[in-house]
Amino acid sequence: MPTPQPHAADAESPFKGKTGLVRIWNAFRYSLAGLRAAYRHEDAFRQEVWLAVILLPAALLSPAGGLGKAIMIASVLLVIVVELFNSAIEAAIDRISLDQHRLSKRAKDIGSAAVLIALLNVATVWALVLSA
């Protein structure tokens, strides 16, 4: 009886294997590279970073209490996180093919919708906290 072959998805990456401080250092470097790439290549990410540069100090200077300020800051940072995911989805789809395809469009539209919801969340959180 033949030995079952592992599924390609189960294969371990040849890039794995670093542990301890080396792994942490490499992960940090890759994260910074991702932030640089997003800032360099994604207009929406740059706009949202500059929005955060304005809103984060505004949250700290607001009359809201500590919890309110924390929620305001978290809502702004959530936009950055969601935009990073959206940009990663778009890059992966473009890597597969630049051809128009309904599933590619669907994935990109869904990612964009996630960013929109995160932005609406900022407006809602800020309105609720500042009106309290």
Residue ranges of predicted features:
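Hydrophobic alpha-helical transmembrane segments
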Residues: 1-88, 96, 100, 114-132
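Membrane-interface alpha-helices at helix entry/exit sites of multi-pass transporters
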Residues: 103-109
